[in-house]
């Protein structure tokens, strides 16, 4: 199992390391569902980024990630082109979150074992190649805002 710093976390602040949190999430996503640790709210919010991915990359995320062919070098290079071609640079926050969402879906599709596969771990290299420091800052802001909303909903449900 992963010795993740963020898998169990329910909160996230400006002092936390978003790059490590995303890497932990992508690693976790590459595991079979039966091999995943029960995650906290941080990963629950990261899961919501798949909705952003559906809006940016289309409703059939499985078909999209299947065509990434992460099990080949040509497919890996093509993946960068595919993802970049879908980014219109109109809603930077949504598109930044969508890239995380599509990479998580790719990690699931190309992983699914008790430990990450070579193909599923290529999403970490794609993360580095596709997501700028500015994009990472936008993802961090979106995560903090969505966590705040999630926590507010939880408080209202308890009352």
UniProtKB/Swiss-Prot annotation:
Family label:
Belongs to the poxviridae B14 protein family.
Disulfide bond annotation, renumbered to this chain: none
What's the domain of life for this entry?
Viruses
Gene3D superfamilies in UniProt = dsDNA poxvirus
Q: What is this protein called?
A: Protein B14 homolog
InterPro entries given in the database record: Poxvirus_Bcl-2-like, Poxvirus_sf
């Amino acid at each position: 199992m992963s010795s993740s710093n963020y898998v169990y976390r329910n909160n996230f602040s400006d002092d936390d390391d978003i790059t490590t949190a995303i890497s932990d999430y992508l690693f976790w996503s590459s595991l079979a569902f039966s091999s995943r640790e029960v995650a906290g709210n941080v990963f629950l919010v990261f899961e919501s980024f798949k909705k952003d991915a559906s809006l940016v990359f289309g409703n059939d995320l499985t078909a999209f990630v299947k065509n990434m062919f992460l099990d080949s070098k040509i497919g890996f290079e093509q993946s960068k082109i595919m993802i970049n071609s879908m980014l219109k640079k109109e809603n930077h926050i949504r598109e930044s979150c969508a890239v995380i969402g599509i990479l998580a879906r790719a990690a699931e599709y190309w992983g699914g074992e008790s430990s990450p596969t070579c193909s599923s771990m290529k999403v970490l290299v794609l993360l580095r190649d596709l997501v700028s420091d500015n994009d990472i800052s936008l993802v961090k802001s979106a995560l903090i805002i969505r966590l705040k909303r999630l926590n507010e909903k939880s408080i209202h449900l308890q009352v």
